[in-house]
Amino acid sequence: MTDKTPLKPSAKLCLVAETLSGPEWSAIVAAALDATAAVTLVLVPAHGASVIAADDARPLVELAQKRDCAVLLADDAATARGIGADGVHLTSREDIETAYGIARSELGPRGIVGVEAGTSRHDAMSLGEAGADYVAFTAGTGDETDLDAQSDLIAWWSELFVVPAVAFAVGPVEHVARLAECGADFIALRVPTGQSPAAIEEWARSAVAAVRIEADAA
């Protein structure tokens, strides 16, 4: 025994990536997926864009799915269905329950509909009861105060509910281990832009080390 609390054995990494075009970005996303063995890729609009371009998303969907990684599009169930993505990630908003209903109708019972509850316990419970495939909790700016709040929410949720909890919008990689210790089923990290595939591989290795996915086998 050590003095460290073992991480939840099922804690896994997910990646969040901007939907950019070109082979260079595809190579970076592929490198991140390979180095982390991420189980889910969430595609979000490119910086400055309000929607996801289907033509830019399609090659990223294909490269991830070839790696047995589920792909979700942020807030666009129709495009997700149209390009063969696995589902949608709904970001936190006032009408999140309505958005969930629309997305579920669009994708059907077999599509993945994950929801971001922000810091709202009420939204989390309502969406979990409605049938969301996971509930994500965010952390604001990612400082220590926000980390405390996010950790508390995940610990509360994991003790009471069976719907998977996702630690979303995670700040520094150093926060990963603590969130896993609190009971997060998935840890979602954003793939940095403006770096080489080699630098991304190093970043990814640090994320894997932080989450200690295979800690229980040690």
Positions of PLM-derived features:
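Glycine-rich phosphate-binding active-site loops on the catalytic face of alpha/beta enzymes
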Residues: S92-I102, Y134-L147, A180-A207
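Generic beta-sheet signal
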Residues: A74, E116, F137-T138, F168, ...
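Conserved catalytic cores of soluble enzyme domains
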Residues: G108, L147-F161
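Glycine-rich tight-turn/loop motif centered on a GG-T
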Residues: H47-S50, A54, G142-Q150
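Catalytic-face loop-and-helix region of soluble metabolic enzyme cores
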Residues: A139, A155-V170
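Active-site phosphate/pyrophosphate- and oxyanion-stabilizing loops and adjacent acidic/basic residues
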Residues: A30, G101, A155
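Conserved N-terminal beta1-alpha1 strand-loop-helix module at the mouth
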Residues: M1-H89, E94-D95, E106-V113, T119-A132, ...
